[in-house]
Amino acid sequence: MKLDWMSFTFALRNLLRQKGRTGMTLASIVFGVVGLILSGGFVEDVFIQLREATIHSRLGHLQIYREGFYAHGSKEPYAYMIEDPAAVEAKAAAVPGVVDTMKRLNFFGLLNNGKTDLPIIGEGVEPAKEAKLGSFFFIIEGRQLTDDDAYGVLLGEGVAKSMKLEVGSFVTVLANTPDGALNSLEFEVVGVFRTFSKDYDARAVRVALPAAQELLGVAGVHAVVVSLADTLTTDATAAAMKAAIGGDGYELKTWFELDDFYAKTVDLYKSQLGVLQLIILVVVLLSVANSVSMTAYERVGEFGTLKALGKRSGDIARLIILENALLGLIGATLGVLLGIALALGISAVGIPMPPPPNSNVGYTALIRVVPSVILVSFFIGFLATVLSAILAARGAARVPVVEALRQNI
């Protein structure tokens, strides 16, 4: 049997003649494709939202340090200062794709509320620039730190709760200077913040950069944080920036290198998605195989008649495969269309999600329409149907003519 237009027409008529079986098989294919599109789109949204929360709550897209700071800076913070941050910022800002740069000065110290002390991680920041970056840096009490707050301080949510502090309270921050002396400054609490990391919120405080430099008795900074227009250009921009500043005794880290939690989460979800895809593939394969096999069994008499009229076993097998290839094509296409429609509809409403591990911040999940997921889902639905048809066709085509014709009696 040649695969011409008449063959396709004949196959389509056979599908329409078996409306019940065709409908059951279509439903199985559509269900599988829709399930893959929705699950893949949901996981992709988790990746995107976690990525952007990581970047825009604290890390930025890139961070530039003095060479050796990332490996040894926690032990010798003052040995790896950027003494001329303006020059570094100028070079970084000249790289295409960079939106903004901001300086940070890190320190360890003690926070005193007049009664008790709490070890803290402090950051001296440029408030106006940080406010633009921090779309996932939530002020839950008070207000954002501003450039006019010479001695204002933002407290992490955990710090404020542990020390029983509120907006308007005064605290003392103590830290060691480069020569080993202990220095202190008094600050007024202007706000309480919450980020995507509960551990960070439990120890972090932020003050204006000049106040941090006064507290530590230094003029430099530890890091220059870089914000980009598009997260997807991070690697390319990092490569260009390394070429611009790498030979001057500086090192550069991307947000991905600074946060291993994201990498572990992505690996976990990809493994789970892979298992889910395998389960859906098996379910679709078994459902379609059962439906196709039943249809082929019910049509054994018809196949016997075709053989009696001169058709060969190969012709019968090709007919069954062609019919189900058309069915798989139609079912996968319908599944894609329905999956996209459901993804857009669900995203319009949103899915309220609880805070992930190590976070106090819940979020609204979406179902992303991801071209690669749609393509994979389409081919899984189509190939599962064709594979099932091949298995059924081998059995149906081998039935002897006499035995097949006996089914017509």
Report the location of each language-model feature.
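Hydrophobic, regular-secondary-structure patches
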Residues: 40-121, 144, 148-149, 243
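Hydrophobic secondary-structure segments that place a key small or acidic residue at a functional site
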Residues: 104-107, 116-126, 138-210
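Hydrophobic alpha-helical transmembrane segments of multi-pass inner-membrane transport and secretion
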Residues: 19-46, 267-302, 325-334, 383-387
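Mechanotransmission and gating elements of multispan inner-membrane complexes involved in transport
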Residues: 177-273, 280
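Short helix-loop junctions at transmembrane helix boundaries
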Residues: 46, 333-377, 390, 394
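C-terminal membrane-exit region of the final transmembrane helix in multipass inner-membrane proteins
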Residues: 369-409
